[in-house]
């Protein structure tokens, strides 16, 4: 069904379709993603959503928007190996913090790092952390977002496994508790719908203009 729908849509494309879909990306798809957030109980403006070629590109765009070579980024220990590779490629340093297999990152350790002003950003997986599978409780997610807001340190939220939840009500992302536009929520349909289509996005908060500009530059190169 998905293949037939894609073929039908492709046949209907006109010469201006590629121009219309330049960054931040297809408006109809961004509206549908915004509706998905609304269905979870919180609002994300369509203008905040930037489409990408899978979640990993979105995560990399977030890193580029927030950091410069030599900056330090907080990650979980252990963490997704692709995060460490991305940091190394951009000349960034990893601050690895202990992570519980049930409830996720140690917020006390994070508070110490933030008090010392050592971190430029955080790359974390509050939901279904890779490789531990930890699911941070909602109260702890709220505390995480509030802690980062006090120090004005942005959070890159890697939420690629959210679509695989098998229970009745999916856990909220940390983005749901963001009131200052500091959480850059990255998602993807690659794990649940069609890995080969590489459809991802970032709901980038106050950093959406920077992401859109970076995505445009990479699309034109």
Residue ranges and their predicted role:
Residues 119-121, 153-154, 184, 199:
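Short, Asp-centered acidic motifs that coordinate Mg2+ and/or phosphate
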């Amino acid at each position: 069904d998905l293949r037939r729908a894609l073929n039908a849509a492709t046949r209907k494309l006109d010469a201006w379709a590629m121009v219309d879909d330049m960054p931040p990306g297809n408006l109809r798809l961004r509206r549908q993603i915004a509706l998905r957030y609304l269905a979870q109980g919180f609002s994300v403006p369509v203008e905040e959503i930037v489409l990408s070629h899978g979640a990993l590109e979105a995560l990399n765009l977030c890193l580029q928007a927030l950091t410069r070579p030599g900056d330090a980024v907080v990650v979980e220990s252990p963490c997704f190996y692709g995060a460490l590779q991305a940091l190394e490629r951009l000349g960034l340093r990893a601050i690895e913090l202990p992570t519980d297999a049930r409830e996720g990152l140690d917020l006390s350790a994070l508070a110490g790092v933030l008090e010392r002003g050592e971190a430029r950003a955080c790359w974390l997986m509050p939901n279904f952390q890779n490789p531990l599978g930890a699911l941070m409780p909602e109260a702890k997610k709220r505390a995480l977002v509030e802690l980062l807001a006090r120090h004005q340190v942005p959070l890159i939220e890697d939420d690629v496994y959210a679509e695989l939840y098998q229970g009745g009500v999916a856990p909220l992302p940390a983005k749901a508790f963001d009131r200052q536009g500091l959480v850059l929520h990255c998602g993807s349909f690659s794990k649940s719908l069609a890995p080969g289509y590489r459809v991802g996005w970032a709901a980038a908060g106050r950093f959406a203009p920077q992401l859109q500009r970076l995505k445009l530059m990479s699309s034109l190169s």
